[in-house]
Amino acid sequence: MSSAKPVLTFVTGNANKLKEVVAILGADFPFELRNQAVDLPELQGEPADIAKEKCRLAAKQVQGAVLVEDTSLCFNALKGLPGPYIKWFLEKTGHDGLNNMLAAYEDKSAYAQCIFAYAPAGAEPQVFVGQTHGKIVPARGPTTFGWDPVFQPDGFEQTYAEMEKVTKNQISHRYKALEALKTHLVKPVDK
């Protein structure tokens, strides 16, 4: 009997994201996680719909089980914007620009949302969502991982960027979504 785990392809070209996902999933994850950068169109719409469609498109290219992620940073004062477009807002405005977007508002609250879409080969994607609530603050900490320097989770005095990786990986939006995925994948098949 083979002890080899089935392969699950995580569709990302982001090395930081891959390291974080592997650290969160841990050695007991029932799949061998491999990453692959797949050229997917930039979709627009609601985050769960974006994640599902990216998953469908990736599954066609990979021809196997896939996992895709869509991350949002949602400002409550802006009714959820920039949301799934955070990557582009950050690229164009920088960390200071994200803060400037809220300059006219008293409400600096926000939530980080991570949606993982998982599809076994030939199946419809399933969605797993995690959210962490916090606030937008002037950038603090290393600027090597997206918007982490401007997001301070509720109950903490540090931004994601200032936190030890172990701490962040126990409270983050990504952790919460991956825990839901893990729970789904290790649940008993029959009832």
Curated annotation (Swiss-Prot):
Its ancestry begins with: Eukaryota, Sar, Stramenopiles, Oomycota, Peronosporales
- Please give the organism: Phytophthora infestans (strain T30-4)
Record function comment: Pyrophosphatase that hydrolyzes non-canonical purine nucleotides such as inosine triphosphate (ITP), deoxyinosine triphosphate (dITP) or xanthosine 5'-triphosphate (XTP) to their respective monophosphate derivatives. The enzyme does not distinguish between the deoxy- and ribose forms. Probably excludes non-canonical purines from RNA and DNA precursor pools, thus preventing their incorporation into RNA and DNA and avoiding chromosomal lesions.
Pfam families, per the entry: Ham1p_like
Q: Which domain of life is it from?
A: Eukaryota
Provide the residue positions that the database annotates as binding Mg(2+). Answer: E42
Q: Which Gene3D superfamilies match?
A: 3.90.950.10
Report the record's Gene Ontology biological process terms. deoxyribonucleoside triphosphate catabolic process; nucleotide metabolic process
Give the protein name, as stated in the record. Answer: Inosine triphosphate pyrophosphatase
Residues bound to ITP are 12-17, 54, 70-71, 87, 145-148, 168, 173-174
Q: What is its EC number?
A: 3.6.1.66
